[in-house]
Every structure is written in C-alpha cells, then in structure tokens.
C-alpha cells in the first residue's frame, strides 16, 4: 500500500502516492537490510522521484523481446556512437554523461543543448507542465560541465485542434474529463513564454503541429541551447567532479 498511498503520517494520513512498484520497493528494502538500518522518509521519497518513469524512463530503457539492450541503448545511444566513430572530426565532447550534451562550436567555445518532453504534466496542468519543462532544461544547461550560459530556448508543441470540443475521459463511466484543447494550447504556450522570456532567455525558434490524435495527450518538447568557454582557468570546462566540502 505504501507504493500507491505513500508514507503514513503519525495521524494515519498518507502523503500521496510514491508510484513505486513491488519490485522497486523490494529493492529498496533489501538495500537497507544490507546496510543494517531503516530508510528515512526523505530517502524513500527521493528514490520514488528519481526512479519514476518520468525521470528514469524504466519502460523506455527496459529490455523488450527482440531488443535485449532496450530501445535507448540500441537506437539512440548505440546509433549515435556508431555515427561518431565513422566521422573523422571528433566534435562531440560530452554525450549521455552530463545534464546536457556538448559539442565543439569553435576552438574557444562549446555549445550544449538539452531537450525534454513534459507531456503528461502538460496534459494535467498545461501552464505548470510547460514552465517546469523549459526551466528544467535551462537548469540542465547551467548544470553542464562547470556551468554553461543558457542563450536560447526552443519548443515543439503537438496539440489537438483548439477549436474542437473533444469528449475524452481518463476514467470509466465518463469520469475525470480531459482538459479542453484550447485550454491546453493556451497554457502550454504561456508556460514556455513565461519560463524563458521573463527570465531573460529568448525563444527564437519553435514549431506547432495540430492533429486530433493529440487530444488525449499533447506532446510538449522544451529545449535550451547554452554556451561555455572551451577552457576555464586553463582546464577543460566539460570535466568536473564533486569534492568533499563542495557547496550544493
């Protein structure tokens, strides 16, 4: 019940779902048995957040019948690695290891780019889903290497037609209706605008595509481009490590 209902408080109320399946809960239990102590509530909720499908992509990276290594390792990471090996110019300096990917812009600068989707959050709360999407990738450029400067945002929205009245529901018996298409469109667009432009990062590029198939869930891509000097104080800027005593 802890996976569905969350941690129980002293007054017997629950904090809300952790979204952890039985296998994940057993893994957490076995680890803390091994180190001979109980987990704190913060540790449990941290694991629930970082192991979520939204953050960890357990389904996307999981093994499937005819692709044992999973879709991500075979078709994204694997394909990228093959292409890079064939090229003579080794311009990719950081891939699949940091908060964003980084390539050489010229001999003095690196450019980094991070794009992520915020589909389900935007279906439930269009403004909140898209603003957390864009500021999240702003953060990822800031977190690249020793800290890149975000210089531009990008977006791609795949939405249902805003002038149509779709009758869709999340639950059986016409319970929990989907938000109206025009409400989703306005909220998604406003979220990226406020998250980027109002913090001083321009949004010069984007695309919008409309189709009935996105009435159940919009596709909301948010992206940020950043710049960072090739070297900082004589050291490669994409190289970093955490040291004891560092501030967070």
Regions flagged by a language model, labelled:
Residues 1-248:
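Core nucleic-acid recognition elements
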């Amino acid at each position: 019940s802890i996976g569905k209902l969350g941690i129980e408080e002293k007054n017997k109320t629950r904090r809300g779902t952790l979204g952890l399946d039985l296998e994940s809960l057993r893994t957490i239990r076995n680890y803390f048995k091994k180190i001979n102590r109980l987990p704190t509530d913060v540790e449990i909720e941290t694991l629930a957040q970082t192991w979520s499908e939204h953050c960890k992509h357990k389904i996307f990276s999981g093994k499937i019948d005819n692709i044992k290594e999973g879709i991500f390792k075979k078709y994204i990471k694997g394909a990228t690695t093959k292409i890079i090996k064939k090229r003579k110019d080794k311009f990719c300096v950081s891939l699949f290891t940091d908060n964003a990917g980084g390539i050489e812009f010229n001999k003095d600068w690196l450019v980094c780019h991070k794009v992520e989707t915020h589909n389900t959050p935007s279906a439930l709360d269009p403004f909140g889903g898209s603003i957390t999407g864009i500021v999240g990738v702003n953060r990822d450029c800031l977190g690249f290497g020793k800290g890149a400067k975000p210089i531009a945002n990008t977006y791609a929205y795949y939405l249902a037609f805003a002038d149509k009245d779709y009758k869709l529901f999340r639950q059986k018996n016409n319970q929990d209706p989907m938000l109206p298409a025009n409400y989703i469109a306005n909220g998604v667009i406003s979220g990226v605008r406020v998250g980027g432009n109002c913090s001083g990062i321009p949004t010069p590029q984007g695309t919008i595509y409309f189709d009935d198939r996105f009435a159940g869930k919009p596709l909301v891509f948010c992206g940020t481009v950043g710049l960072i000097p090739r070297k900082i104080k004589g050291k490669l800027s994409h190289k970093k490590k955490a040291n004891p005593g560092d501030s967070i």
